[in-house]
Regions:
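Conserved ABC ATPase signature
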Residues: 152-156, 160
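Conserved ABC transporter NBD signature motif
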Residues: 71-82
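Conserved ABC ATPase "signature" region
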Residues: 79, 129-147, 256-257
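ABC ATPase NBD coupling module
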Residues: 22-26, 80-96, 122, 129, ...
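A short, proline-enriched helix->beta-strand linker immediately N-terminal to the Walker B motif
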Residues: 171-175
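Short catalytic/signature loops enriched in Gly
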Residues: 3-4, 17-23, 239-330
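P-loop NTP-binding/switch modules centered on Walker-like glycine-rich loops
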Residues: 178, 182, 186, 190-268
Length: 330
């Protein structure tokens, strides 16, 4: 049985908003509302949803880059929530991150070798020669030359810069890599190359991915399991192939309808999603998706649905999950 690399339990993150008056009530953006999931060793887990759904906030909290209001994040059984910088330092080698922007995430004043080696500061027992050897090894693994270590980021294309970022994430030989929209800033022609590289590296090193994306086609290609987020909550979770073939939440269904897939052979009327996600700033009764949902009924406005089992390792938070695939019929 595969061991659990990442376990997130009831994670909560609320951002306070500026008060409208001195004695006014404190308002919040409810970015994460009790998010829970696990990722097994050697697998890829996708987090999908529109901008503003909480994906990147989740990534920052998993990486302990900001304070968490409540909940637990365990990496290889080690709790990271509430840890000080000094306490996190020896744990950092086990989890690394690849950021969205290959231009902004690399210091232009540092050589590639220095950038890639930076995470090794968490590994105390490496000498200079071993660090240099590790840099050469990992640059070769991502399709770059060891001699590229002497160059600067501006000498590389966007796709090459993202390879440098991936090399930096791999340098400590982590168990987990959190990839936040790692190909969205790249040309379409380069995206496939980077995705193939990520798959090859997983086969070679056995690394586990938490992969964040708004592009469901990318998640389908790379991820074994996935969770769909809406306004800070997971509304559906399961094996990627199961969710694609049998979505159990109307939000998931609508997101999937937006993905061209001529090879699927399935014919169904496409449902369009009206409006956009602006962030949840107040608690409200009922389902958070009710204003945009084509299936909304009185029960949805009165009672918030909870995650329930809809199949093997497949859960969804919808009162009418068994009717989702009937959307647009007739």
């Amino acid at each position: 049985m595969s061991k659990t690399v990442l376990k997130v339990t009831d994670l909560v993150r609320h951002y306070p908003l500026p008060k409208e008056s001195l004695f006014g009530d404190q308002r919040y953006v409810y970015a994460l509302n009790g998010v829970s999931f696990e990722i097994k060793e050697g697998s890829s887990f996708g987090i999908v949803g529109e901008s503003g759904c909480g994906k990147s906030t989740l990534a920052r909290n998993v990486m302990a880059l900001e304070e968490t209001d409540a909940g637990s994040v365990q990496i290889l059984g080690n709790e990271v929530v509430g840890k000080s910088f000094a306490e996190l330092r020896p744990l950092r080698q086990h989890f690394q991150m690849v950021f969205q922007d290959p231009y902004g995430s690399l210091d232009p004043h540092h050589t590639v070798g220095r950038i890639v080696a930076e995470p090794l500061t968490a590994v105390d027992d490496l000498g200079k020669s071993e660090r240099e050897a590790r840099v050469s090894e990992v640059l070769s693994s991502v399709g770059l030359k060891p001699t590229d270590a002497e160059k600067y980021p501006h000498e590389f294309s966007g796709g090459q810069r993202q390879r440098i970022a991936i090399a930096r994430a791999l340098i400590t030989r982590p168990a987990l890599i959190v990839a936040d929209e790692p190909v969205s800033a790249l040309d379409v022609s380069v995206q496939a190359q980077v995705l193939n590289l990520l798959r090859d590296l997983q086969d070679e090193f056995g690394v586990t991915y938490m992969f964040i994306s708004h592009d469901l086609a990318v998640v389908e290609y790379l991820c074994d399991e996935m969770a769909v987020m809406y306004l800070g909550s997971v509304v559906e979770k399961g094996r990627t192939e199961d969710i694609y073939s049998n979505p159990a939440h109307p939000y998931t269904r609508i997101l999937l309808d937006a993905v061209p897939n001529p090879a699927s052979g399935k014919k169904r009327n496409r449902i369009r999603l009206e409006g956009g996600v602006t962030g949840q700033t107040e608690r409200r009764q009922g389902c958070s998706f009710q204003d945009r949902c084509p299936m909304a009924q009185d029960k949805c406005r009165a009672e918030a649905p909870v995650l329930k089992t809809v199949g093997d390792d497949h859960i969804a938070a919808c009162h009418f999950s068994d009717k989702v695939n009937e959307l647009g019929a007739g």
